[in-house]
Amino acid sequence: QMDEGLDTGAVLLQRTHPIGPDTTTHQLHDELAQLGAQCMVDVLSDFKSHTPVTQRVEGVTYAKKIEKQEAILDWSQPAQVLARRLRSFDPFPGGVTYLKNEALKIWSATAHSNELQSSLPGTVLHVSSDGIDVACAQGVLKITSLQRAGGKRLNAAQFIQGFDGLVGAVLHTTDQN
């Protein structure tokens, strides 16, 4: 049955699915594709026993198109906010920051500590094969996967092999040229 609104028509079957604390958009997409396929099989195998049910309209939100500027990481935000943002932006558009006038795409990171930082937000505090620790206004973001412009996605250990003097460098929201 067709309906005039966007995703507002009656449904034959509905399922819930948990979202883990470290789930990326890419992972959620794949999990929901599997769940959706199973739901289709369930409905089609016993179609007559399913009755269309009107969807609730309360609490429904519309996800607008992600704009390019939304990918820019604002280091004055808490580390936990940035880590969630990066998970939501994987596989598109990724997070963007600038290091020494070079655009970097950040793919994955974890938030550590929830304390206010004395370092300037965006300052690289520590580098190891486990990740690149960056000061945020609140907490530290450990970057674990990133990409140089025109390059391929690398884990932190691979990335730091091509960069000297990262500790103390400041990541920016814009190109500093």
What are these regions (language model features)?
Residues 42-98, 105:
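Active-site-lining helix/loop region of Rossmann-like oxidoreductase modules
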